[in-house]
Amino acid sequence: MTYQNSSKPPFRADHVGSLLRPTLLHEAREKFALGDMTSNDLRQIEDKCISEVIKKQEAAGMKAITDGEFRRASWHYDFLCSLEGIEQTAPPQGPAFKMGHQINSLSISSKITNPGGVMLDHFRFLKETTKATPKFCIPAPSLAYHRGGRDLIDGTVYPDIEEFWFDLCAAYQDEIAYLSDAGCDYLQLDDTTFAMLCDPKIRDQMTERGDDPNQLIKTYAKGIANAVSAKPTDMTVTVHMCRGNFKSSWIAEGGYEAVAENMFSNLSVDGFFMEWDTDRAGGFEPLRYAPRDKIIVLGLVSTKLPHLETKDDLKRRIDDAAKYIPLENLCLSPQCGFASMAVGNNLSEDDQWRKLALVAETSEEVWG
């Protein structure tokens, strides 16, 4: 394929989405939580901080601009729990971050519906505020199932699991239609499940609860396909996958070999954001399964550590990846967001901007 850098995303220099929240926003949220600030005042501060972070992304050389997810506490709970029928619940025994933090699950206690564009106002402000390409990120539908499985889906509400998937994907179709009507043509679905299923321990946990890990890949891919089935042809949809990202910690370990052939053959999107910042992600060999009409965005720059990678190392790793898929099919980005949760990772805002500038500069030198 011929891939042009200038106009259509994903871009040669791209990024995942979430950014470190500034002190002003953290303080405002604390005041709001204590009842010392109104929702209108909080909104004004969010608007101010988002406007500033948009300018900084543009100055760093990014062509895809996000709102940093500054209105969210979490990359996934805020969206999913805004859908009718889905709520957070105590974590079951299962995957945890390496520093010990246990993650909440999601339970389904009533029919899933979309109450009417749950993040539409987020996108509208983003689009109004940037002259570049607004990129919007929402969690993939698989997150509503993966952590709790069938046990956390009320059997009286959904006696047939296919009805659950149908309603869930219909809610996504509604949201994507709202976003498209508002002018969104670059949508990213954040999905940790594919990379989690690279880890033998997590695969064992899925098997123990009654799920077939290989079938889950197909089920999750089908869910994404159904969710985006009505998208307009000019909307680019990518999937970002990672092994966990909270306070610079992670959950899963293991290369993509365990999922690559199954995933690439079943997941029909325009591009894949895949992390390869450490040995936890294995080598680039699984890229031999990647379709030649898709774009692979190499997540080579760590958002977990302040250490700044070098251009030479990034170029060498891009060359290594190009042994398995043409260079024209590759782009560059950080491996994940800098703040998947509002608390953020253990690096500074200056570190963050240096890393994004490095992505832009390296990309320009590699692809022009």
Model-derived regions, located:
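Domain-level signal for soluble alpha/beta catalytic cores
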Residues: 1-368
